[in-house]
Amino acid sequence: FRKLYDLTENVIPKEIGSAQPSFDESLDWACTGALRCLGFATAKEISDFYDFVTASEARAWIARGLRSGALREIKTEAANGQLRDRVIFTQDWPNLQEHLAVSNRLRILSPFDPALRNRARAEEIFGFSYRIEVFVPAARRQYGYYVFPIMEGSALIARIEVKANGEKYNLN
C-alpha cells in the first residue's frame, strides 16, 4: 500500500481513468461483489448491500446467473427454522459443503463484518439481535459503547466490550 499525492492524471493511467463502464457492467460488478461478500443471498440482500441496484435489477441478474449456470439456488434455514430461497455462486458450492463442518473455535467479529452488516439478515440467520451502540446515549445503551459479537462455530453466542487501558496497554 502506498499513498500518493498528485493530480489524478499523473497517477492513474488514462485508459483506466477514462473507462466508463456500461450500466450492465456496473450492475454485474455490484451484484457480484455483494454476493462474494455475503456468500449466499436473496435479491433484496444483494440490492441492499451497496444500495446501488434495485431488488428487481438484482432479481434479473440472478435469473441470468441461474440460466447461465453461474448461480445456483439453495435453501437456508433461519434461526426460527423457516426456510428461505437464496443463491450462491455455483463454483462456491463445493467449498460450502466442505465448510459446513465449521470449527468450534471462538472468533470475535468486527461490528462491520459482512455477516453482520445487514442487522435484520443477521438476526434472521443467527437469531442474534445485534446493534452497534456508539451513537446511542450512554444511559440508553443495552450492552456498551463498542461491543463485538462472539461467534463459536456457526453461531453467534455472546458479546464483549473491550476497553483499552492506555497507561498499562492492557485490554479490559
Where are the model-predicted features located?
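Long, low-complexity intrinsically disordered regions
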Residues: F1-R107, F112-L116, R121, F128-I132, ...
